[in-house]
């Protein structure tokens, strides 16, 4: 039996490639245990939280950088103000599973398991999303393989929110694409749109950039409102309800953590923090600026030039694939211009615009080096690379991207497991 036969056994083939690549990355992480850590934060954290009962080597090697915040939240809840920079979704999931199965002291390994399972689900969701949009099995397979080999590397194996975020985003995209294949007035379409909103809402609890998913529902709402200019009908009004509910669910996913923080810090008789008096009292934007110095052009300093250079290849891929696909969707999905409806092309263009916006914000506002892991949750560049691999004129470009992302992921894996930058 050929495990790599994408035509007859695509799911088995993708799962086999996924298992092989993850085994390779985990071997790198375990191999890094030979040398001493650059930073002792992990060992100190586990000593404080778990005492003499130290976790296994794999857990310590993957609990690096921001994973410490996620794991502290999973074990102790949000104790310090700066912890609100990180989503509540991943720690809540770990805490719930550990409580349900009585797996206290196993939080890190449970989080690692969640990351792996959600990454695999994301791979399969991307495959099915591509099939729904253009029915090209080879393109779907290649795009999913590129997602397996994501430059995010060990970040999507570690106790981070990147894998669950990609999972919920791709599931949301898939449900939205399924809705476009149904009759405009059908219950199936409306339920799929609401389900997509719920998925994106959950993604907002994992990473704040899940809010970009709301653009899909805003576009659909505008379309429905414009349709009302030609006359009112019950079906047109009902058609408007689903994207409105979907958009509200996305907003709730983003706002809910802010409300919880406001109730904790701003709703008592104690001295309130400065952000409580802001016009929009968001703890997230406050702690990002206060503790991580995130803001417009704040990262544009001479000492950050190496990080901009490090991020340049991935930014170039995101911008090039995004802008090309916005102009002509077939540059990303070869068959999307032929045999698919205008709604599907609009969806692809919207996803390309969201990806382009992410890249621009990474340049102007974010810590630019995180783009390699943020990119893992956006499908357009995977389609674009896959289409390059299938196009003889652009095939060398596609192979070049594959070589780059695999080398980047492998090297970054060794650095990550040793607690070395960049993060």
Curated annotation (Swiss-Prot):
Keyword Thylakoid: no
Chief site of localization: endoplasmic reticulum
Cellular component, GO annotation: endoplasmic reticulum membrane; mannosyltransferase complex
GO BP annotation list: GPI anchor biosynthetic process
Cell location: Endoplasmic reticulum membrane
Superkingdom to which the source organism belongs: Eukaryota
Entry's Gene Ontology molecular function annotations: alpha-1,6-mannosyltransferase activity; glycolipid mannosyltransferase activity
InterPro entries referenced in this protein's UniProt entry, alphabetically: PIG-V/Gpi18
Enzyme class: transferase
TM regions (residue ranges): 11-31, 106-126, 139-159, 160-180, 197-219, 240-260, 299-319, 351-371, 400-420
Disulfide bonds, paired cysteine numbers: none
Keyword vocabulary terms for this entry: Endoplasmic reticulum, Glycosyltransferase, GPI-anchor biosynthesis, Membrane, Transferase, Transmembrane, Transmembrane helix
Pfam family name, one: Mannosyl_trans2
Keyword Ribosomal protein set for record: no
EC nos: 2.4.1.-
Entry's family note: Belongs to the PIGV family.
Free-text function comment from the UniProt entry: Mannosyltransferase involved in glycosylphosphatidylinositol-anchor biosynthesis. Transfers the second mannose to the glycosylphosphatidylinositol during GPI precursor assembly.
Protein name as annotated: GPI mannosyltransferase 2
């Amino acid at each position: 039996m050929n495990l790599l036969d994408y035509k007859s056994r695509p799911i088995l083939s993708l799962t086999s490639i996924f298992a092989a690549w993850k085994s390779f990355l985990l071997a790198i992480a375990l191999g890094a245990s030979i040398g001493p850590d650059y930073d002792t934060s992990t060992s100190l954290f586990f000593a404080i939280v778990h005492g003499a009962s130290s976790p296994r080597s794999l857990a310590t090697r993957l609990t690096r950088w921001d994973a410490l915040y996620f794991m502290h939240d999973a074990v102790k809840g949000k104790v310090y103000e700066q912890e609100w920079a990180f989503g509540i979704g991943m720690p809540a999931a770990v805490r719930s599973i550990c409580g349900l199965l009585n797996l206290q002291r196993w939080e890190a390994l449970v989080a690692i398991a969640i990351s792996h399972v959600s990454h695999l689900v994301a791979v399969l969701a991307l495959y099915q999303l591509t099939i729904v949009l253009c029915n090209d099995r080879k393109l779907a397979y290649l795009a999913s393989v590129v997602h397996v080999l994501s430059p995010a590397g060990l970040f999507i194996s570690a106790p981070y929110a990147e894998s669950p975020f990609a999972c919920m985003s791709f599931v949301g995209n898939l449900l939205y694409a399924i809705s476009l294949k149904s009759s405009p007035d059908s219950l199936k379409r409306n339920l799929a749109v609401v389900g997509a909103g719920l998925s994106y809402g959950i993604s907002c609890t994992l990473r704040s950039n899940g809010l970009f998913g709301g653009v899909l529902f805003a576009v659909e709402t505008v379309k429905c409102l414009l349709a009302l200019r030609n006359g009112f009908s019950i079906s047109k009004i009902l058609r408007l309800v689903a994207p409105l509910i979907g958009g509200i669910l996305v907003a709730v996913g983003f706002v809910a953590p802010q409300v919880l923080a406001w109730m904790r810090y701003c709703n008592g008789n104690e001295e309130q923090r400065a952000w409580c008096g802001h016009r929009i009292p968001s703890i997230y934007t406050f702690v990002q600026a206060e503790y991580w110095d995130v803001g417009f052009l704040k990262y544009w300093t001479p000492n950050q030039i190496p990080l901009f250079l490090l991020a340049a290849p991935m930014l170039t891929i995101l911008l090039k694939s995004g802008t090309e696909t916005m102009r002509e969707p077939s540059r990303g999905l070869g068959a999307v211009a032929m045999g698919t409806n205008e709604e599907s092309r609009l969806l692809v263009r919207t996803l390309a615009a969201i990806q382009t916006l992410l890249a621009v914000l990474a340049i102007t506002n974010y810590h630019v080096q995180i783009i390699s892991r943020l990119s893992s949750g956006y499908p357009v560049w995977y389609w674009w690379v896959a289409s390059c691999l299938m196009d003889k004129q652009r095939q060398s470009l596609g192979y070049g991207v594959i070589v780059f992302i695999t080398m980047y992921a492998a090297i970054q894996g060794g650095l990550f497991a040793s607690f070395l930058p960049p993060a």
